[in-house]
Amino acid sequence: MHTADGELPDPPLDVAQSLRVSKLTQGELQEMDRVLLAQASHSFRKVARIVGTAIGELQGKIPDVPDIYYAQRVRHLVELGKLESQGNLRYMRFSEVRLPQASPLS
């Protein structure tokens, strides 16, 4: 599936990337999620921006993790309800996330 301008979705992890992420510890995954959530706000932000900033912050602590995996972690956080999304999360350049909005009291 392509976007209107022919953009392909984010590719799956290749073998080397899959091997790298399979070695991440639970603590590293928690740190990655913490940093991703810290980059989010109550206004929608591009997933690519959040991913890029998180990579920059964690490169010294958790090196060689591909951006595609960070985007997968963002999708995971959306599934857990820790982030809200708009757009197709399979296209990190064309999707946005934010922290959950407080639901109004009825």
Regions found by a protein language model. Give the residues of each.
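Long, low-complexity, charged/polar intrinsically disordered regions in eukaryotic proteins
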Residues: 1-33
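Eukaryotic, polar/proline-rich low-complexity intrinsically disordered regions
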Residues: 2-6, 42, 46, 105-106
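Positively charged, polyanion-binding regions of nucleic-acid-associated proteins
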Residues: 25-46, 57, 75
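Short acidic, hydrophobic short linear motifs in intrinsically disordered regions
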Residues: 43-65
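Short amphipathic alpha-helical interaction segments
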Residues: 62-79
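A short, conserved structural fragment
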Residues: 78-89
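Short, cationic-aromatic polyanion-contact patches
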Residues: 88-106
